[in-house]
UniProtKB/Swiss-Prot annotation:
Upper lineage: Eukaryota, Metazoa, Chordata, Craniata, Vertebrata
PANTHER family, A to Z: ATP-DEPENDENT RNA HELICASE RHLE-RELATED (PTHR47959), NUCLEOLAR RNA HELICASE 2-A (PTHR47959:SF19)
Keyword RNA-binding: yes
Protein name: ATP-dependent RNA helicase DDX50
Motif (Q motif): 137-165
Length: 737
């Protein structure tokens, strides 16, 4: 066992430490004489260098095991050896971050008792455990100062991510660059680290009232604040300021007077300072447009042009270095960006022609739900997918929707709002509280969609499909960050199914259609939360309730009494079933599975009409064909499900209640006419000619219904397109700060 080996090694090492200095020297001379007869020259020099004799050397297998423990996450064995063998080594060694070899070798020199050959073999094993990404991103591969490395490690960064590796060289060398990478991959540090190193390398005499050398423009206040924080976290020599609306002008004026090296901000407030003559951008050397697709859109393009036009001259190589970053870069961005770029510029695209544009660490789910049922279903989704401890963001389309959702009683967790009408000071308090876990649910508009880096977010909910694919990609990217996995759930109505397919096509993702959380899912999640809450109850408090608990056990029995208590603690005293197909309350989804493949749902209707009473069949609605054509699923009122199961007797068709929504071939489209047509066709079919006539009539009405539906969809699509065009064309009239 490793523990015994480690203890044995330490016990062996303790004996020579207690010897006097003269005894130690005498014994070492004797050992060296013996070693001439038993070891080759390499081994003799190794013994003299380390001052450790052969009777102290543990077998290599033991040392290898100890070193492997060190190179994983546990270094206790190494620390104990170090403390015992080197009295001057008082402080406990910190964890080795991500297998950083240089740091490991530097710290390991403190322990002179370790065998050199074993040390080298351990380094080789450490090399083998590093991934290709870690090797390519090792700090030693880049001109990064020790001070910056130390600050990066303080932020938990132990190597550069792929986008940072690809962009470091061009940014550090002063080249213009357009970079695209998925959300959550570290784009901010992609320009922050090399710019800081470049400025610190060429740092001039610090003067008061010095003009900024770096300008970073961001579309939202929240993103600007976060980018500024990232800069501040990795430099102590440079002055970093952040200007955005909703905050005091005076504090920003004081920053200008004291001198700024790196200025981060939103276009509106920076333009205000320029027009007032307080801010001088004539000394700019580097310009960064973060979320460039939004910065160059009509809503911001005019303000960006007003801010930086004085620093740019046509086709001049003396123009500032221009760096453009985003997770989404449509082709028009590249065309518009050329007016700011030098003739030779670099392009880094880690998305490229890959099918999937969204983050690969996010699972995308879709739930069909009528808008009136949405708050209640979202409450259940939060409970099952996030629990009481997980963090979640709910995106809504309007500020009014955000407020209503956050205040809805179905959202049991503590939720806070974030949108443009909230005062900036409160927005900052809200974001700080969400980061620190003071509350678990943030309900927001698109102000929280871009750039916010909160790795602990487990779940993103989109209350409806967004109007454009870029919004979906950025919203879903608020989870699954920094190597973690996440879930994004999009709610939709039947008429929005086309929007969902459009997002799938353009973002390169596939939504997994799921039903609302089942009763068992809710019970399991709530009971786990209740059990966890019991751990916080002190023994002193428990003593007060022992008599009552004993009385309950005698009356109800231990299991029933505890089950009732857990149900009450979790707030789950009752459950009302919902349709897995549409999320409607008061319905149960059932499946009717065939032993053979069926052509369409009419086969199931025929079988139901043959086996069940007409009254029972009339209760069935929303029938859908299952994947593989091996049956159907449908909804019945909660009161009818048990009666249908009791009436059903058929060995070739299996009627059951599924725990989760099965995979569906054809989805219910919100129109009951098709179900009615199929029912009437088959029931009339038993009457001969009239049945065929009824079927034909139903077919004609069905075709008319479908044509009307398509016409309505086209009109609805034109309305949505018109809204988007109006929004874009009028964007330049808005003021962004």
């Amino acid at each position: 066992m490793p523990g015994k080996l480690l203890w044995g090694d330490i016990m062996e090492l303790e004996a020579p430490l207690e010897e006097s200095e003269s005894q130690k020297k005498e014994r070492q001379k004797s050992d060296r004489r013996k070693s001439r007869h038993h070891y080759d020259s390499d081994e003799k020099s190794e013994t003299r260098e380390n001052g450790v004799t052969d009777d102290l050397d543990a077998p290599k297998a033991k040392k290898s095991k100890m070193k492997e423990k060190l190179n994983g996450d546990t270094e206790e064995g190494f620390n104990r050896l170090s403390d015992e063998f080197s009295k001057s080594h008082k402080s406990r060694r910190k964890d080795l971050p991500n297998g950083d070899i240089d740091e490991y070798e530097k710290k390991s020199k403190r322990v002179s008792s370790l065998d050199t050959s074993t040390h080298k073999s351990s380094d080789n094993k450490l090399e083998e455990t590093l991934t290709r990404e870690q090797k390519e991103g090792a700090f030693s591969n880049f001109p990064i100062s020790e001070e910056t490395i130390k600050l990066l490690k303080g932020r938990g960064v132990t190597y550069l991510f792929p986008i940072q590796v690809k962009t470091f060289g061009p940014v550090y060398e002063g080249k213009d660059l357009i970079a695209q990478a998925r959300t959550g991959t570290g784009k901010t540090f992609s320009f922050a680290i090399p710019l800081i190193e470049r400025l610190q390398r060429n740092q001039e005499t610090i003067k008061k009232s010095r003009s900024p050398k770096v300008l970073v423009l961001a579309p939202t206040r929240e993103l600007a604040n976060q980018v500024a924080k990232d800069f501040k976290d990795i430099t102590r020599k440079l002055s970093v300021a952040c200007f955005y609306g909703g905050t005091s002008y005076q504090s920003q004026i004081n920053h200008i007077r004291n001198g700024i090296d790196i200025l981060v901000g939103t276009p509106g407030r920076i333009k205000d300072h320029l027009q007032s003559g307080r801010l001088d951008l004539s000394k700019l050397r580097h310009v960064v447009l973060d979320e460039v697709d939004q910065m160059l859109d009509l809503g911001f393009a005019e303000q960006v042009e007003d801010i930086i036009h004085e620093s740019y001259k046509t086709d001049s190589e003396d123009n500032p270095q221009t760096l453009l970053f985003s997770a989404t870069c449509p082709q028009w961005v590249y065309k518009v960006a050329k007016k700011y770029m030098k003739s030779r510029y670099e392009q880094v695209d880690l998305v490229g022609k890959m099918t999937q544009k969204a983050a690969t660490t996010v699972e995308h789910l879709a739930i069909q739900c009528h808008w009136s049922q949405r708050p209640a279903v979202i409450g259940d989704v939060l409970q099952v997918y996030s629990g009481s401890e997980g963090r979640a963001i709910i995106f809504c389309e309007t500020k009014k929707n955000v407020t209503e959702m956050a205040m809805n009683p179905h959202i049991k967790q503590n939720a806070q709002c974030l949108h443009g009408d909230i005062a900036q000071s409160q927005r900052e308090i809200t974001l700080k509280g969400f980061r620190e876990g003071s509350f678990k649910v943030l309900v927001a508009t698109n102000v929280a969609a871009r750039g916010l880096d909160i790795p602990e977010v487990d779940l993103v909910i989109q209350s409806s499909p967004p109007q454009d694919v870029e919004s979906y990609i950025h919203r879903s990217g608020r989870t699954g960050r920094a190597g973690r996995t996440g879930i994004c759930i999009c709610f939709y109505q039947p008429r929005e199914r086309g929007q969902l397919r459009y997002v799938e096509q353009k973002a390169g993702i596939t939504f997994k259609r799921v039903g609302v959380p089942s009763t068992m899912d809710l019970v399991k999640s709530k009971s786990m939360d209740a059990i966890r809450s019991l751990a916080s109850v002190s023994y002193a408090a428990v003593d007060f309730f022992r008599p009552s608990a004993q009385r309950l056990i005698e009356e109800k029995g231990a299991v029933d009494a505890l089950a009732a208590a857990l149900a009450h603690i979790s707030g789950a005293s009752s459950f009302e079933p919902r349709s897995l197909i549409t999320s409607d309350k008061g319905f149960v989804t059932m499946t009717l599975e065939s032993l053979e493949e069926i052509q369409d749902v009419s086969c199931a209707w025929k079988e139901l009409n043959r086996k069940l009473s007409s009254n029972a069949v009339s209760q069935i609605t929303r029938m859908c064909l299952l994947k593989g054509n091996m049956g159907v699923c449908f909804d019945v009122p909660t009161t009818e499900s048990e009666r249908l199961q009791a009436e059903w007797h058929d060995s070739d068709w299996i009627l059951s209640v599924p725990a989760k929504l099965p995979e569906i071939e054809e989805y219910y489209d919100g129109n009951t006419s098709s179900n009615s047509r199929q029912r009437s066709g088959w029931s009339s079919g038993r009457s001969g000619r009239s049945g065929r006539s009824g079927g034909r009539s139903g077919g004609r009405s069905g075709r008319q219904s479908r044509q009307g539906s398509r016409s309505g969809s086209r009109q609805d699509g034109r309305r949505r397109s018109g809204n988007r065009n109006r929004s874009r064309s009028g964007g330049h009239k808005r003021s962004f700060d």
